[in-house]
């Protein structure tokens, strides 16, 4: 079986995010000298492509209780009230408010809700093309990035460093690798 890749324009219709092939990752500066990287599971999402790009929309749901950074102690701490408070805020969402072209790429603007706080963010989005997988599914791939202030989402936990500065940067880079399947 082969996979056919044809970088074409998206066709209008509804596309479901394939959660097993979609990843939401983040990185944040740690102690001012290195980065901590992690991911959170995407549990659902839909991309609706309109005949007119302005009629398009994106919605994504994430589960913060799945956070993983490669360190079980840190992951456990991130789930507590010091950070994500997953008992109280068990779901994060992104719902687009506009989609437009920026040269050959897209800009998706929308409301991101983390920790019970909703803020408008802009995702710089690259369309990677479409492919028909061995099972006959038409797939579209995207990569998107944005940078947020964790303080703006009520994530204020930190510790001062002896030499000055803080343990955890306010700036968090979020990246999404998306595979969406065209619905009949």
Please report, for each region that a protein language model flagged, where it lies by residue.
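Low-complexity, acidic/polar, glycine-enriched regions of mature
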Residues: 1-184
């Amino acid at each position: 079986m082969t996979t056919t890749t044809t970088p074409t324009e998206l066709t209008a219709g509804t596309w479901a995010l394939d959660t097993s092939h979609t990843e939401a990752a983040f990185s944040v500066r740690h102690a001012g000298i290195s980065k901590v990287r992690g991911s959170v599971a995407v549990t659902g999402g839909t991309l609706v492509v309109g005949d007119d790009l302005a009629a398009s929309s994106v919605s994504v749901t994430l589960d913060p209780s799945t956070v993983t950074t490669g360190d079980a102690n840190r992951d456990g701490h991130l789930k507590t009230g010091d950070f994500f408070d997953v008992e109280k805020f068990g779901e994060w969402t992104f719902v687009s408010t506009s989609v437009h072209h920026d040269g050959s790429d897209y800009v998706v603007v929308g409301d991101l809700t983390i920790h019970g706080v909703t803020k408008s963010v802009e995702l710089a989005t690259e369309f990677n093309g479409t492919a028909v997988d061995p099972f006959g599914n038409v797939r579209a791939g995207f990569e998107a990035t944005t940078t947020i202030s964790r303080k703006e989402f009520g994530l204020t936990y930190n510790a001062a460093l002896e030499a000055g500065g803080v343990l955890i940067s306010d700036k968090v880079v979020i990246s999404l690798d998306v595979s969406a399947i065209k619905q009949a």
